[in-house]
Amino acid sequence: KPRFAEIDEIAELNQTKVIAAMQKNRVNATHFAASTGYGYDDEGRDNLERVYASAFHTEAALVRPQITCGTHALAIALSANLLPGDEMLAISGKPYDTLEEVIGLRESPCSLKEYGVSYAQVDLREDGSFDFPAIERALNDKTKLIHIQRSKGYCPRPTISVDAIGEA
């Protein structure tokens, strides 16, 4: 198939998935009405989150215009899932530079480190694969979250495949 035909096919499948999620959650005109802005009883916002959860096959979704970038979304997710005394283990090497302050690799007020969350890291092997023996050695009772950065970001390595993440 020509590349543009593949892209069109993917776009159509995604559109069908979103329409099905909207139908499942019975989106109607009332969901587009203005709200008080206080966030209480905002059925439109709540239903939008159900649509996202349905479309992406997740338990729940948090969809807010106040989440301004990927780092902001990751900071929220990390803060929500880690408590003082917990450890975050990165198994694909050092995360994006923008997460360094969130984690506390660079000093920053309100970082996970300042909150009492520790950080450990296992680098990828030279061939870009996960180092499973090193990961097993790094796991401990405090490890509560394993971070995998699929994107290569600014690192000279290939993007980690979904299959490789599934194996991890």
What is the meaning of each model-derived region?
Residues 126-168:
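Active-site phosphate-binding strand-loop segment of PLP-dependent enzymes
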Residues 61-87, 95-106:
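Conserved beta-loop-alpha segment that forms the PLP phosphate-binding cup at the N-terminus of a helix
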Residues 1-58:
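Glycine-rich phosphate-binding segment of PLP-dependent enzymes
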Residues 59-63, 86-89, 118-120, 144-145:
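Structural motif
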Residues 97-120, 138:
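Flexible glycine-/small-residue-enriched beta->alpha junction loops
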Residues 92-97, 152:
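Acidic, glycine-rich active-site loops and adjacent beta-strand->loop/helix elements
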Residues 26-33, 111-120, 147-152:
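Gly-rich Lys/Arg/Thr-decorated short loops/hinges at beta-loop-alpha junctions or inter-strand turns
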